[in-house]
């Protein structure tokens, strides 16, 4: 997993990406520019999209974009360059992970919430840049969405066992 990869990193920066996601052509370049400007953690807006653009997927996308679907994270809603509480698909200086330690391997999901909490405890900030955009495919069928949201809720509960403040 991530901890194995982090042990092998030889460069200055680490970019975390996940499944069901694609990026603007300048995604990596724009992340690197912000790191070169002195930021430790940087990312951009994550925009939910459909795969086939049919009416069923459009309806599920409306649900996904609500506060009940993807939540209230600033990286889904903000457009301006500012510090936010967390990021998806961020680029980190390698030294950040050296400072805060490895991912909690007991967490199969929501491990980034716990990791970001520890980063904030160490004083790191999360810069949202309007020049950085990622796109995440929303689930294309209702059963898939229900399964995903159930899993998210389950893992939030498990994560709270390890870190009660990482969702506040």
Regions found by a protein language model. Name each.
Residues 18-22:
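The conserved acidic donor/metal-binding loop of glycosyltransferases
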Residues 1-9, 30, 87:
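Glycine-rich, basic loop-to-helix element that forms the pyrophosphate-binding segment
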Residues 70-95, 108, 114, 134, ...:
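A recurrent flexible, glycine/aromatic-enriched loop bordering the glycosyltransferase active site
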Residues 14:
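Short aromatic/hydrophobic "clamp" motif used to bind/position activated sugar donors
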Residues 25-58, 133:
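Conserved donor NDP-sugar-binding/catalytic core segment of glycosyltransferases
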Residues 50, 98, 104-167:
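Catalytic donor/gating beta->alpha subdomain of glycosyltransferases that bind UDP-sugars
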């Amino acid at each position: 997993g991530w901890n194995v990869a982090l042990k092998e990193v030889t460069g200055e920066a680490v970019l975390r990406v996940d499944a069901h996601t694609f990026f603007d052509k300048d995604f990596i370049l724009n992340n690197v520019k912000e790191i070169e400007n002195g930021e430790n953690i940087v990312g951009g807006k994550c925009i939910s999209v459909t795969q086939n653009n049919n009416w069923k997927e459009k309806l599920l996308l409306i649900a996904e974009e609500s506060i009940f679907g993807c939540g209230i994270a600033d990286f889904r809603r903000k457009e301006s360059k500012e510090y936010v509480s967390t990021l998806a698909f961020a680029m980190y200086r390698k030294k950040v992970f050296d400072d805060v330690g490895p991912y909690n391997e007991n967490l199969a999901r929501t491990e980034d919430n716990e990791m970001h909490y520890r980063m904030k405890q160490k004083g790191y900030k999360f810069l949202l840049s309007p020049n950085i955009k990622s796109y995440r495919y929303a689930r294309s069928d209702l059963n898939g969405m229900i399964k995903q949201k159930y899993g998210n809720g389950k893992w939030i509960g498990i994560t709270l066992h390890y870190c009660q403040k990482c969702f506040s």
